[in-house]
């Protein structure tokens, strides 16, 4: 089972489960812990191959979003958590959206930061080039290049550093498995875009998240259960670069439940 960490407020408090993205770990949420634990039980999970869950799935050759989502569901089942709000960043937003499809009763609401709903043409080209080069280049060279492209500006540096420093802990074999998984995600994303969202959802995007923002804007226009808050002058990793703003928006949304 995946490794996790609990901050328990009280037996009556609602649960909030945090899901990081590819290459990260639950440590990506270090700027959220104090704000959220004031009123909620908090569950931080390290996805397979990441953080404290590293090395647990070495015999598995190929991953799917289904099995990764079920990993998370297994943790909540083990802890006897019947319902939780979910907060995800980047690729983690795909996982929580998938959990809402697989086991909707488990999801009370979703907060999706730096959400990925569609890979634009540039990102698809980058993924293809990275896949070709992964056999000859060190995996961190590919990851650092992606980090610089997704978070290109000087003011994105702190987010970029967190992004890269966590990825350094990822084994090469693990990186390749997640990379292949991401390369095959387009059919799942198409399915998500076609479906009406089935849970109250808040999308929090950086105004400078040029790869992913436009797809989210279009999606929210067509889904009455979805809200969008765009943080100006902010890149992809909004919970790090604009932590106070992110926390205030998120907690305001959760206070409605």
PLM features per residue range, with description:
Residues 121-123, 139-195:
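Conserved alpha/beta-hydrolase catalytic His-Asp/Glu region
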Residues 240-252:
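Post-His helix in hydrolase/transferase enzymes
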Residues 101-102, 107-137:
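Flexible "cap/lid" loop of the alpha/beta hydrolase fold
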Residues 88-92, 96:
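Gly/Ala-rich beta-loop-alpha elbow adjacent to hydrolase catalytic centers
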Residues 31, 98-102:
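Active-site signature of alpha/beta-hydrolase-fold catalytic machinery across serine-
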Residues 200-234, 240:
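Conserved loop-alpha-helix segment in the C-terminal half of the alpha/beta-hydrolase fold
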Residues 34, 43-87, 248:
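Active-site loop/oxyanion-hole signature of alpha/beta-hydrolase fold enzymes
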Residues 5-57:
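Conserved HGGG/HGGXW glycine-rich cap/lid loop of the alpha/beta-hydrolase fold
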């Amino acid at each position: 089972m995946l490794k996790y960490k609990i901050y328990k407020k009280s037996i009556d408090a609602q649960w909030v489960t945090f899901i990081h993205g590819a290459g990260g770990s639950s440590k990506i949420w270090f700027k959220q812990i104090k704000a959220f634990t004031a009123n909620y039980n908090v569950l931080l999970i390290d996805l397979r191959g990441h953080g404290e869950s590293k090395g647990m799935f070495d015999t598995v050759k190929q991953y799917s979003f289904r099995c990764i989502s079920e990993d998370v569901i297994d943790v909540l089942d083990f802890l006897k958590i019947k319902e939780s709000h979910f907060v995800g960043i980047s690729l983690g937003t795909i996982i929580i959206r998938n959990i809402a499809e697989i086991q909707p009763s488990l999801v009370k609401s979703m907060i999706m930061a730096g959400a990925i709903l569609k890979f634009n043409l540039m990102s698809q080209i980058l993924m293809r080039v990275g896949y070709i080069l992964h056999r000859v280049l060190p995996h961190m060279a590919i990851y650092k290049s992606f980090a610089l492209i997704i978070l290109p500006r000087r003011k994105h540096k702190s987010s970029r550093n967190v992004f890269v420093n966590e990825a350094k802990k990822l084994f090469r074999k693990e990186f390749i498995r997640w990379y292949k998984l991401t390369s095959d995600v387009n059919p799942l994303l198409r399915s998500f875009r076609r479906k009406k969202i089935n849970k109250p959802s808040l999308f929090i995007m950086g105004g400078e998240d040029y790869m992913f923002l436009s797809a989210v804007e279009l999606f929210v226009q067509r889904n009455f259960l979805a809200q969008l808050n765009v943080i100006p002058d902010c890149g992809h990793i909004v919970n790090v670069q604009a932590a106070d703003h992110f926390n205030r928006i998120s907690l305001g949304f959760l206070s409605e439940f």
